[in-house]
Amino acid sequence: MSESEIPGQVVVDLEADQSAEGGRRMVLNMGPQHPSTHGVLRLLMELDGENIMKCVPDIGFLHTGIEKEFEEKFYQQAVTLTDRVDYLAPLSNNLGWCLAVEKLLQLEIPPQAQWMRVMLTELTRLNSHLVWLGTHALDIGAMSVFLYCFREREEILKIFELFSGQRMMTSYFRIGGLALEPPRGWQQRVKKFLDVFPSRIDEYENLLTNNRIWTGRTKGIGFISLEDMLDLGITGPMLRAAGLKIDARKDAPYSSYEKFDFEVPTSTDNDVFARYQVRVEEMRQSTKIVRQAMEGMPAGAWKADAPHVVLPDREKMKTQMEALIFHFKIVTEGFRVPEGEVYQVIESPRGELGYYVVSDGTTKPYRVHMRTPSFGNLQAVPKMVEGSLIADVIASIGSMDFVLGDTDR
């Protein structure tokens, strides 16, 4: 069997030949087991000395067929699948799925549930950005920042554990509201974090922003034109670092985001350093949103009054036969969703996350497709690194903040 006939083999026209300077070109394989690709990403690069002449990303190593799995699950069961797509921002994926199905059901969500969703997804954004900043800094040689970022991330994970019992795969949002009543004392835990975190962001910036090594490795590196970004469908902090103020929370508000006061950070330099600046400022804005949600949290129900969709309270099940019947039917048979199709967009930490859901009127979705930001953003790799030095590849791909589960699905 020839190389071109091997199943799954990526055939790339990269051949070592004579360079213009009379030297030899070399084909370098980076990944898929490489610590700085942050997942199973493979890059095939053609080098002329230390210059990258051509780069081809090879993805798909983390493909799970998760979109097909949706078709075999009841709508309420599929929430747990969404956690596994972008595993650094599970609540963002929970929210996108729930909003899409709720739109098909024309289900009205109580204000407290909406605000709680906003607060927790912004904490998720902070969690994700902390992982990005810590690992990105570590890749470039700043180990202290990595340790400090994970120190703060630990406090956020403790908040998630308080709400859901889980640190990462939380599955805390449900179609119709939340999975559980918000726990006692959550305000004190969140306030304790908010009182400390702004000074921690200052600490990160003091270590990096004016650091000559950091600026030397990030300024003017990883440039890609705005036209190319739009052609490739790049969204999120990468696009905002190129000067476009596009954010679904502002442009297409959902879950009461229109009631919150925050800014959308942008830059115009469009390099690795600009993406760092945008994400750091996003952490400040997310902290601002979390505080507004905590202090202005509406009173009332934390899930919709829809017994055919939302599981009844445990106390009602002990005393009301009707509640017990509804619980049994939802768990064993699911609930029917009106026939139709919907596309719901939210702003995940990595960019525009869209859920396209088709219902045929049964208890399981007919088709689900996710427009994940990591897949689009990863298309920028060749444009970003070709013509640059091999030493700058790690900084460039680190600035994209992609998640391979989000890319491969």
Swiss-Prot record:
Pfam families: Complex1_49kDa. GO terms for cellular component: plasma membrane. Its main location: membrane. Its EC number is 7.1.1.-. It comes from the Bacteria. It is found in: Cell inner membrane. Gene3D superfamilies: Cytochrome-c3 Hydrogenase, chain B. It is a peripheral membrane protein. Keywords: Cell inner membrane, Cell membrane, Membrane, NAD, Quinone, Translocase, Transport, Ubiquinone. GO terms for molecular function: NAD binding; NADH:ubiquinone reductase (non-electrogenic) activity; quinone binding. It is an enzyme of class 7 (translocase). SUPFAM superfamilies: HydB/Nqo4-like (SSF56762). It catalyses: a quinone + NADH + 5 H(+)(in) = a quinol + NAD(+) + 4 H(+)(out). NDH-1 shuttles electrons from NADH, via FMN and iron-sulfur (Fe-S) centers, to quinones in the respiratory chain. The immediate electron acceptor for the enzyme in this species is believed to be ubiquinone. Couples the redox reaction to proton translocation (for every two electrons transferred, four hydrogen ions are translocated across the cytoplasmic membrane), and thus conserves the redox energy in a proton gradient. Belongs to the complex I 49 kDa subunit family. PANTHER family: NADH DEHYDROGENASE [UBIQUINONE] IRON-SULFUR PROTEIN 2, MITOCHONDRIAL, NADH-UBIQUINONE OXIDOREDUCTASE 49 KDA SUBUNIT. NDH-1 is composed of 14 different subunits. Subunits NuoB, C, D, E, F, and G constitute the peripheral sector of the complex. This is NADH-quinone oxidoreductase subunit D 1.
